[in-house]
Protein backbone atom coordinates (compact mmCIF):
# COMPACT_ATOMS: atom_id res chain seq x y z
CA UNK A 1 0.00 0.00 0.00
CA UNK A 2 2.82 2.43 0.87
CA UNK A 3 4.52 1.81 -2.46
CA UNK A 4 1.24 2.51 -4.32
CA UNK A 5 0.77 5.82 -2.48
CA UNK A 6 4.34 6.85 -3.28
CA UNK A 7 3.89 6.03 -6.99
CA UNK A 8 0.47 7.73 -7.11
CA UNK A 9 1.67 10.87 -5.33
CA UNK A 10 4.79 10.98 -7.53
CA UNK A 11 2.61 10.70 -10.64
CA UNK A 12 0.34 13.51 -9.41
CA UNK A 13 3.36 15.70 -8.64
CA UNK A 14 4.74 15.05 -12.15
CA UNK A 15 1.38 15.96 -13.75
CA UNK A 16 1.18 19.13 -11.62
CA UNK A 17 4.69 20.22 -12.61
CA UNK A 18 3.98 19.47 -16.27
CA UNK A 19 0.79 21.50 -16.25
CA UNK A 20 2.43 24.33 -14.34
CA UNK A 21 5.16 24.56 -16.96
CA UNK A 22 2.63 24.56 -19.79
CA UNK A 23 0.57 27.29 -18.17
CA UNK A 24 3.64 29.39 -17.44
CA UNK A 25 4.09 30.06 -21.15
CA UNK A 26 1.39 32.77 -21.25
CA UNK A 27 1.55 33.34 -25.01
CA UNK A 28 -1.39 35.32 -26.37
CA UNK A 29 -3.84 33.58 -28.67
CA UNK A 30 -2.52 33.07 -32.23
CA UNK A 31 1.11 33.18 -31.03
CA UNK A 32 3.30 30.06 -31.21
CA UNK A 33 4.69 28.99 -27.81
CA UNK A 34 8.09 27.31 -28.04
CA UNK A 35 11.04 26.93 -25.67
CA UNK A 36 9.81 29.60 -23.26
CA UNK A 37 9.26 32.20 -25.99
CA UNK A 38 6.26 33.29 -28.05
CA UNK A 39 6.37 33.80 -31.83
CA UNK A 40 3.97 35.75 -34.04
CA UNK A 41 3.82 36.36 -37.76
CA UNK A 42 2.96 39.90 -38.81
CA UNK A 43 1.62 40.11 -42.36
CA UNK A 44 2.31 43.82 -42.86
CA UNK A 45 5.17 44.17 -45.34
CA UNK A 46 8.19 46.02 -43.93
CA UNK A 47 11.87 46.47 -44.62
CA UNK A 48 14.07 44.38 -42.29
CA UNK A 49 15.12 47.27 -40.01
CA UNK A 50 11.51 48.54 -39.75
CA UNK A 51 10.35 45.02 -38.89
CA UNK A 52 12.95 44.76 -36.10
CA UNK A 53 11.87 48.17 -34.75
CA UNK A 54 8.21 47.07 -34.85
CA UNK A 55 9.04 43.96 -32.80
CA UNK A 56 11.01 46.01 -30.25
CA UNK A 57 8.19 48.53 -29.86
CA UNK A 58 5.55 45.79 -29.59
CA UNK A 59 6.89 44.81 -26.18
CA UNK A 60 10.24 45.42 -24.45
CA UNK A 61 12.57 42.49 -25.07
CA UNK A 62 10.95 41.47 -28.36
CA UNK A 63 13.00 41.05 -31.54
CA UNK A 64 12.75 39.49 -34.94
CA UNK A 65 12.86 35.73 -34.33
CA UNK A 66 16.06 33.79 -33.83
CA UNK A 67 16.14 30.07 -34.66
CA UNK A 68 18.65 27.88 -32.85
CA UNK A 69 17.72 24.26 -33.45
CA UNK A 70 16.82 22.13 -36.42
CA UNK A 71 13.82 20.95 -34.42
CA UNK A 72 12.40 24.48 -34.22
CA UNK A 73 12.24 24.92 -38.00
CA UNK A 74 9.32 22.56 -38.77
CA UNK A 75 7.19 24.00 -35.96
CA UNK A 76 7.87 27.59 -37.04
CA UNK A 77 7.29 26.69 -40.70
CA UNK A 78 3.93 25.08 -39.92
CA UNK A 79 2.85 28.06 -37.82
CA UNK A 80 3.79 30.52 -40.61
CA UNK A 81 1.98 28.40 -43.21
CA UNK A 82 -1.15 28.46 -41.03
CA UNK A 83 -1.13 32.19 -40.19
CA UNK A 84 0.71 33.98 -43.03
CA UNK A 85 -1.72 35.73 -45.33
CA UNK A 86 0.19 36.16 -48.56
CA UNK A 87 3.06 34.73 -50.51
CA UNK A 88 5.91 36.95 -49.33
CA UNK A 89 9.04 35.71 -47.68
CA UNK A 90 9.31 36.27 -43.91
CA UNK A 91 12.06 38.21 -42.14
CA UNK A 92 13.90 36.67 -39.18
CA UNK A 93 16.42 38.39 -36.94
CA UNK A 94 19.65 37.31 -38.61
CA UNK A 95 21.84 39.87 -40.39
CA UNK A 96 25.39 40.49 -41.49
CA UNK A 97 26.15 43.97 -40.11
CA UNK A 98 29.85 43.71 -40.95
CA UNK A 99 29.09 42.52 -44.50
CA UNK A 100 31.68 39.77 -44.18
CA UNK A 101 29.51 36.64 -43.79
CA UNK A 102 29.57 36.93 -39.97
CA UNK A 103 25.88 36.47 -39.23
CA UNK A 104 24.41 37.80 -35.97
CA UNK A 105 20.98 37.63 -34.32
CA UNK A 106 19.30 40.87 -33.26
CA UNK A 107 18.68 39.44 -29.77
CA UNK A 108 22.46 38.87 -29.46
CA UNK A 109 22.00 35.14 -28.95
CA UNK A 110 24.61 32.71 -30.30
CA UNK A 111 24.62 31.97 -34.00
CA UNK A 112 24.73 28.24 -33.37
CA UNK A 113 22.44 26.97 -36.15
CA UNK A 114 22.08 27.96 -39.81
CA UNK A 115 19.62 26.62 -42.39
CA UNK A 116 20.56 28.16 -45.73
CA UNK A 117 18.77 27.40 -48.98
CA UNK A 118 20.89 25.97 -51.80
CA UNK A 119 23.74 28.30 -52.89
CA UNK A 120 23.02 30.71 -50.02
CA UNK A 121 24.13 32.99 -48.56
CA UNK A 122 25.62 34.77 -51.55
CA UNK A 123 25.48 38.53 -50.77
CA UNK A 124 24.24 38.84 -54.36
CA UNK A 125 25.74 41.95 -55.99
CA UNK A 126 27.10 42.77 -52.53
CA UNK A 127 23.63 43.97 -51.47
CA UNK A 128 22.07 41.13 -49.43
CA UNK A 129 22.76 41.29 -45.71
CA UNK A 130 19.42 40.41 -44.03
CA UNK A 131 17.82 36.98 -43.76
CA UNK A 132 14.38 35.76 -44.78
CA UNK A 133 12.55 32.45 -44.57
CA UNK A 134 11.91 31.27 -48.13
CA UNK A 135 8.27 30.59 -49.01
CA UNK A 136 8.95 27.97 -51.71
CA UNK A 137 10.85 25.85 -49.15
CA UNK A 138 7.83 25.89 -46.83
CA UNK A 139 9.57 28.56 -44.72
CA UNK A 140 12.21 26.04 -43.60
CA UNK A 141 15.27 27.38 -45.43
CA UNK A 142 16.94 30.79 -45.41
CA UNK A 143 18.07 33.31 -48.00
CA UNK A 144 20.07 36.49 -47.65
CA UNK A 145 18.16 39.41 -49.12
CA UNK A 146 18.40 43.16 -49.65
CA UNK A 147 17.45 44.65 -46.28
CA UNK A 148 15.18 47.27 -47.87
CA UNK A 149 12.97 44.58 -49.46
CA UNK A 150 9.46 44.44 -47.98
CA UNK A 151 8.44 41.18 -46.29
CA UNK A 152 6.14 39.87 -43.62
CA UNK A 153 8.08 39.19 -40.42
CA UNK A 154 8.26 36.91 -37.39
CA UNK A 155 8.65 38.45 -33.93
CA UNK A 156 9.66 36.58 -30.79
CA UNK A 157 8.74 37.80 -27.31
CA UNK A 158 8.73 36.60 -23.74
CA UNK A 159 5.42 37.15 -21.93
From Swiss-Prot:
Which family does the similarity line name? Belongs to the true venom lectin family.
Q: Could you read off the lineage of the organism from its UniProt record?
A: Eukaryota, Metazoa, Chordata, Craniata, Vertebrata
**Name used for this protein in its record:** C-type lectin BJcuL
Q: Which InterPro entries does UniProt cross-reference here?
A: C-type_lectin-like, C-type_lectin-like/link_sf, C-type_lectin/snaclec_domain, C-type_lectin_CS, CTDL_fold
Q: Name one Pfam family in it.
A: Lectin_C
Q: Which residues form the signal peptide?
A: 1-24
As for what it does, the entry says:
Galactose-binding lectin which recognizes specific carbohydrate structures and agglutinates a variety of animal cells by binding to cell-surface glycoproteins and glycolipids. Calcium-dependent lectin. Also binds lactose and raffinose. Shows high hemagglutinating activity on mammalian erythrocytes. It also involved in immunological functions, since it is able of inducing potent neutrophil activation. In vivo, it causes edema and increases vascular permeability after injection into mouse hind paws (10-100 ug/paw).
How is the activity of this protein regulated?
Answer: Hemagglutination activity is inhibited by lactose (MIC=2.5 mM), galactose (MIC=10 mM), and raffinose. Is very weakly or not inhibited by gentamicin, kanamycin, glucose and sucrose.
MF terms from GO for this chain are:
carbohydrate binding; metal ion binding
Amino acid sequence: MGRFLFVASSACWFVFLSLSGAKGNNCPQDWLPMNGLCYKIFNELKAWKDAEMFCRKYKPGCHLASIHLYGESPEIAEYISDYHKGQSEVWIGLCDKKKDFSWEWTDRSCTDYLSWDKNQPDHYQNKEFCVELVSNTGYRLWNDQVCESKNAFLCQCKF
